[in-house]
UniProtKB/Swiss-Prot annotation:
It is found in: Cytoplasm. Its cofactor is Mn(2+). GO terms for biological process: proteolysis. This is Probable cytosol aminopeptidase. Its EC number is 3.4.11.1, 3.4.11.10. The active site is at K279, R353. The gene is pepA. GO terms for molecular function: manganese ion binding; metalloaminopeptidase activity. Mn(2+) 2 binds at K267, D272, D290, E351. It comes from the Bacteria. The keyword Cytoplasm applies. CDD domains: Peptidase_M17.
Length: 495
């Protein structure tokens, strides 16, 4: 899809036009112009009940007096002063669905005239593009019959005042980069585990170096990790025939070459059967999504390189598999982590933290400004927060606040969970420094508390995306979250 911003007189538009109308007969500014241009055509439709302005109604008009447009899409938006971000998203989705059914190739949109509380035209345009791209998304790589690309809308033009052109163009630039990052994160996550193994994940990371000359990629195999004493990470991989691989993606574009990097660490379990503590068979296929943390870090790094933000950022994709085998690690094993701390394994299905603890220790060598890990870590987080908010745990209040601000800006929502010393009590072991689980209560928090033991040398935040990384049912598939949140965080950091 090609997006642009122009300022064209309504009477001169000869393609397709999208106009907003509201309940109680209220019209957007350009809808008023259209009504005057067409000698009250829209007013008459409202009077006879053809146009209600209710959200969800889209009326298609053709052959309108004094108007060159092929079609006019009259979009009902509900109460003018009560439109929420969620409703705005639904309005965009319904509009795009209707347009695609007409096979229109170009539209000129005035929906950016919709006013939302505390949002400006930059946000309206950016959010619209991200919504449109998400609506277009198809993952048909492994289907014998592909989606018919001829049905896809080709050009989407935002009609904005001349003085707002630069603002609109920046919004388009940001939105397209983020939307591509989300798409690639979804593509990797939706890939089946017989294709997307740790080696495939590493190959995807290496492809980023071809996308941008600002990126360098190093891949560590099991031999290199063993030399670094990453025995906790390696234990998880023991039951798999596929070698564990950790990809380190370095993006350097800060004016000060010595500026400390921001580090993003993504959990990359390309399949998690639970190991010896085997998961139930029901929905086990969804455990290909246990690498969504790594996929989202990949997506963020792609968006970052596309935007060429003036930052130093390092993305780590911690890839491996957790499978049952005669060589698998066992409940009762005691592992020595890269940090030197020992961990008693009480459940092999609490493996993500065993991988991440070594990855979090590894990134100390970069002397980071801050570190954020992203992981589908706990079912307990899904129980606590459902599928709308990612769980946020942080040792640094300012970092947590910045992430929550980015979540609010993008509607890629997160909710901060507590992290106090009491939770460490649940991780005590009679035989090692730590246990890898903390019992029944507060599982999302105790998982974060476990990781906190390996992050004492830098500001750290943890995003548990177990509830937000993918959808089930008829809409089954990866969401690409939290690419939007993290990219916005980096945009804010670059200012």
């Amino acid at each position: 899809m090609k997006y642009s911003a122009k300022n064209t007189a309504l009477s001169q538009i000869d393609s397709n036009i999208i106009l907003a109308v509201f309940e109680d007969g209220e019209l957007s500014p350009t809808a008023m112009q259209f009504d005057q241009l067409s000698q009250g055509y829209l007013t008459r439709l409202i009077q006879v009940g053809e146009v209600s302005g209710k959200q969800g109604q889209v009326l298609i008009l053709r052959d309108i007096p004094n108007c060159q447009a092929q079609r006019i899409f009259i979009v009902g938006c509900g109460k003018k002063d009560k439109i929420t971000e969620r409703q705005y998203k639904q309005i965009i989705q319904k509009t795009i669905q209707t347009i695609l059914e007409t096979q229109a190739s170009e539209v000129v949109s005035f929906l950016n005239e919709i006013e939302l509380k505390n949002r400006d035209i930059h946000w309206n345009i950016r959010f619209a593009i991200e919504t449109i791209e998400a609506s277009h998304y198809q993952f048909d790589t492994f289907k014998s019959k592909k989606t018919d690309a001829s049905l896809v809308l080709d050009r989407f033009i935002f009609n904005v005042p001349t003085e707002l052109q630069q603002n609109a163009l920046q919004a388009i630039s940001y939105a397209q980069a983020i939307a591509l990052g989300v798409k690639y994160a979804k593509d990797i996550a939706n890939c089946p585990p017989n294709v997307c193994n740790p080696t495939y994940l590493a190959e995807q990371a290496q492809s980023l170096a071809k996308h941008s000359n600002l990126i360098n990629v190093q891949v560590l195999g099991e031999k290199e990790m063993a030399e670094l004493n990453m025995f906790s990470y390696l234990a998880v991989s023991q039951g798999s025939a596929n070698e564990a691989k950790m990809s380190v993606i370095e993006y350097r574009n800060h004016p000060d070459k010595n500026a400390k990097p921001i580090v993003l660490v993504g959990k990359g379990l390309t399949f998690d059967a639970g190991g010896i503590s085997l998961k139930p068979a029901d929905s086990m296929d969804e455990m290909k999504y246990d690498m969504c943390g790594a996929a989202s870090v990949f997506g963020v790094m792609y968006a970052l390189a596309t935007l060429q933000l003036p930052l130093n950022v390092i993305g780590v994709l911690a890839g491996c598999e957790n499978l049952p085998d005669g060589n698998s690690y066992r409940p009762g094993d005691i592992l020595t982590t890269m940090s030197g701390l020992t961990v008693e394994v009480l459940n092999t299905d609490a493996e993500g933290r065993l991988v991440l603890c070594d990855a979090l220790t590894y990134v100390e060598r970069f002397n980071p400004e801050l570190v954020i890990d992203v992981a589908t870590l706990t079912g307990a987080c899904v129980v606590a927060l459902g599928q709308h908010n990612s769980g946020l745990i942080a040792t640094d209040g300012k970092l947590a606040e910045k992430l929550l601000n980015a979540a609010e800006e993008t509607t890629d929502k997160a909710w901060r969970l507590p992290l106090s010393e009491e939770y460490q009590e649940q991780l005590k072991s009679n035989f090692a420094d730590l246990a890898n689980i903390g019992g029944r209560w507060g599982g999302a928090i105790t998982a974060g508390a476990f990781l906190a033991n390996f992050t004492k040398n830098y500001p750290w935040a943890h995003l548990d995306i177990a509830g937000t990384a993918w959808l089930q049912g008829t809409n089954k598939g990866a969401t690409g979250r939290p690419v939007s949140l993290l990219t916005q965080f980096l945009i804010n950091q670059s200012k």
